[in-house]
Amino acid sequence: MDPSELKNIPLFAEVPDDKLLKVATFASLESAVEGKVIIREGGSANAFYAIEEGKVKVERDGEHLADLGPGDFFGEQAVLEKSERGATVTATSPVRLIRIDHWEVPRMKRAMPEVVEELQRKIRERSGSSD
């Protein structure tokens, strides 16, 4: 994927260009139509996502937790902690997502630990409010 697309995601905005090139090798683009379930509560954690365009809703046990849009990310907690998904995330408009598969996380941690540390910091900030 084009590394410049990652610059629009706050998580990656401060990553130096040389490391951003590496992040881009770990990432892929994915699209989803309105109404598509992107991750399902209780499911296995196979990837985490950052929203490039569009909006999603986050629900747990059928209760609405949050609406997310461009620049936001989700699914990282279950991937980093190797746990089940804690929430269902559904597209509420057509969305364009940056996807990083779970098997890329160890490689990413070796190549750029500061990015993974930032993810972990964000998890602590959210204190489990969504996944």
What function would you assign to each model-found segment?
Residues 58, 76-77, 87-91, 107-108:
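Short beta-strand His + acidic residue motifs that chelate non-heme Fe in jelly-roll/DSBH
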Residues 68-69, 77-78, 108-112:
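A short, polar/proline- and glycine-enriched secondary-structure boundary/capping micro-motif
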Residues 3-61, 68-70:
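Regulatory nucleotide-sensing modules
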Residues 2, 19-22, 84-86, 102-131:
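A small-molecule sensor/coupling module
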Residues 94-104:
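A short hydrophobic beta-strand segment most commonly corresponding to one strand
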Residues 51, 61, 82-83, 90-92:
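A short, compositionally biased micro-patch
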